[in-house]
Design a protein with these regions (language model features):
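Short, surface-exposed secondary-structure edge patches
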Residues: 40-45, 76-81, 96, 104, ...
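N-terminal accessory targeting/assembly segments
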Residues: 2-124, 130-131
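P-loop NTPase catalytic core
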Residues: 250-251, 257-578
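A residue-level detector for short acidic-glycine micro-motifs
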Residues: 29-32, 65-67, 75-77, 109, ...
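C-terminal amphipathic alpha-helical interaction region
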Residues: 568-616
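Short, surface-exposed secondary-structure boundary micro-motifs
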Residues: 43, 57, 93-94, 112, ...
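Metallocofactor- and cofactor-centric catalytic cores in central/energy metabolism, strongly enriched
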Residues: 69-71, 93, 183, 187, ...
Length: 616
């Protein structure tokens, strides 16, 4: 009597995902299990990067290699307990994310499962485990919540991919724009109606111009994570992303639509810097990816962000944030999925004409996952064991940033700015992840261990760091005409101070002349009174106008001391003693609010100029 293969156990009703039913799916058998990598034979017709369900618990995996009828699958869940002979199903679809109202304030894992729902009891009232159970499949967006939809087009109107269909007030300060999906053909709108709808309810139809079958329109749609969303054209990034961090905005600014990395060794402040950027950057939406980092760091974000106010709207900071949590104890293969999930969500909001900032902490953990999976695949290793395709994977990620003109008959401008943390072992910037990232990004904010040991934060090394974004014209037009000149002068003084410090370490400061001592003192003032900034005080965010006032006063004081010493009116030590009240005022600048500094600036500048002319 022939034996029949048992079908996989049914999922609870709220753990469903609308993929191909298992009865129609190509089925294979596991022939090899090596950590997160599984080989299966018999998956005829499977395509590269299709999602596969592995084993009796239907673990989520992705086909990453095909050789005949043998498929190699990287599994995004713990593979403990899998055995040779277990069945594998090809779902017939790539790994995709669900995009629509309900994303903001959401907390997802690397494959977009909503983590808060995993703590709720299942259909039988049984509490969930403290860790994610294997094989759990949850819809990313709430299927029960109804969203009020207001159409922006009428029946019979002609629309194209990317056109605005209507809006949904997702938060009190944010109206979610519902667009024609990018993969839909041009056509006419039919039956679009207002009202309250669930994300998967049909709100109307699109009748294609080419006579094809009519397409349903919904509040949400799906998009493959590895496929960049289409755009009309790229634009030159010429508007800075204001971060509120003086060392970044003044010395090494990044443009909206730009890319940057923050490399640094252990304890140099990568995560705090990324969290500060996520809190205070003037982006419309922030996507924060915790890729392989400690769970406590993600907990800090979850605890702090709901309590913080968005400086632009006054609402909770979580109302503009999407969190992707993929901590270090989660399966390593899911780190790659979390990176692609995050950037696809960022592109979705970009298509709505918004400026999005994506924080990836840390891309090095993604690189480690690539190295581990590559080793399991027995591929030829590259430098330090990383796969040979590391550079192309990084390029594919960072190139999804940019300032773009979106699709649609009325194009919008939107941007995705990618800022990735890099954790080189031992702080060695010559390792492959740092070097390959360095070739791809436009700004490099190098964190220095020595600065961190001296408790100088942000510990961004002003000598090793750089930016390729030329934004002087914007700062000249929107802040002050003197901004580029002051920035260049500050960088020159910091460079000269670093060179003099090397001499001081050899012969001591007493061997220097008074002009050199002036440079050393100004470098000290720039470091302590301007560049140093606490992330846990009212000085955590510094507006551009305040940055200009502070830099203008410090450099005006430098000019006054330099003038006295050069003319011989007084020695350097005498100048320091006589100007003690001015110096105390300079060190207190960071404690002042913008309004206070704006009111005090003319008097402080006049005080410095008066002292420079008469010494008293």
């Amino acid at each position: 009597m022939p034996t029949t293969t048992p079908s996989p156990p049914p999922k609870p009703s709220h753990y469903t995902r609308p993929l191909r039913p298992m009865g129609d799916a190509p089925k294979g058998v596991i022939t090899r299990v090596s950590g997160p990598v599984v080989e299966a034979r018999g998956l005829k017709g499977a395509l590269l990067y299709h999602v596969a369900w592995v084993g009796p618990e239907r673990l989520i995996g992705e086909i990453i290699r095909l050789a005949g009828d043998v498929a190699t699958i990287q599994v995004y869940e713990d593979t403990s307990g899998l055995k040779v002979g277990d069945e594998v199903w090809d779902t017939g679809a790539p790994l995709w994310v669900e995009l629509g109202p309900g994303l903001l304030g959401g907390i997802f894992d690397g494959v977009q499962r909503p983590l808060p729902l995993l703590t709720q009891p299942d259909d039988q009232g049984r509490p969930q485990e403290p860790y994610i159970a294997r094989g759990v499949i949850l819809p990313a967006l709430d299927r029960q919540q109804r969203w009020p939809f207001t159409p922006a087009v009428n029946d019979g109107d002609h629309v194209e991919p990317g056109d605005l269909l209507g809006t949904v007030p997702e938060t009190p300060h944010f109206h979610h724009r519902i667009l024609v999906p990018p993969d839909y053909p041009p056509g006419r709108v039919e039956g679009l109606r207002s009202g309250e709808f669930r994300v998967r309810e049909v709100i109307g139809h699109l009748i294609p111009d080419n006579g094809g079958p009519r397409r349903p329109l919904r509040l949400s749609h799906r998009w493959p994570v590895r496929k960049p969303r289409p755009i009309r054209r790229r634009l030159d990034p010429n508007i800075p992303l204001i971060t509120g961090q003086r060392v970044i905005d003044t010395l090494f600014p990044i443009a909206k639509g730009g890319t940057a990395i923050i490399p640094g060794g252990f304890g140099t402040g990568k995560t705090v810097t990324e969290q500060s950027l996520a809190k205070w950057a003037d982006a419309d939406i922030v996507v924060y990816i915790g890729c392989g980092e400690r769970g406590n760091e993600m907990t800090e974000v979850l605890v702090e962000f709901p309590e913080l106010k968005d400086p632009r709207t006054g609402g909770p900071l979580m109302h503009r944030t999407v969190l992707i949590a993929n901590t270090s104890n989660m399966p390593v293969a899911a780190r790659e999925a979390s990176i692609y999930t995050g950037v696809t969500i960022a592109e979705y909001f970009r298509d709505q004409g918004l400026d999005v900032a994506l924080m990836a902490d840390s891309t090095s953990r993604w690189g480690e996952a690539l190295r581990e999976v590559s080793g399991r695949l027995e591929e030829m290793p590259g430098e330090e064991g990383y796969p040979a395709y590391l550079a192309s994977r990084l390029a594919g990620f960072y190139e999804r940033a940019g300032l773009v003109e979106t699709l649609g008959q009325e194009p919008r401008q939107g941007s995705v700015t990618i800022i990735g943390a890099v954790s080189p072992p031992g702080g060695d910037f010559s390792e492959p992840m740092t070097q390959n990232s360095l070739r791809l990004v436009g700004a490099f904010w190098a964190l220095d261990v020595n600065l961190a040991r001296r408790r100088h934060f942000p510990a961004i090394d002003w000598i090793a760091s750089f930016t390729h974004y030329h934004l002087d014209d914007w700062f000249r037009d929107h802040v002050d005409a003197l901004w580029p000149e002051l920035r260049a002068q500050a960088q020159r003084l910091l460079q000269e101070e670093r060179e003099l410090e090397e001499i001081v370490q050899l012969v001591g400061s007493d061997a220097l002349g008074d002009p050199e001592k002036v440079i050393l003192d100004t470098g000290y003032l720039l470091r302590e009174a301007f560049l140093q900034q606490s992330a846990f005080s009212d000085d955590a965010f510094c507006p551009l106008e305040k940055q200009f006032f502070m830099l203008r006063l410090v450099l005006a004081y430098h000019g006054a001391v330099k003038q006295h010493v050069r003319s011989g009116r007084c020695t350097f030590d005498q100048c320091i003693q006589e100007s003690a009240p001015i110096r105390r005022s300079l060190f207190r600048l960071k404690e002042m609010t913008l309004d206070e500094l704006r009111a005090a600036f003319p008097d402080l500048l006049a005080q410095i100029e008066h002292w420079s002319q008469g010494r008293h």
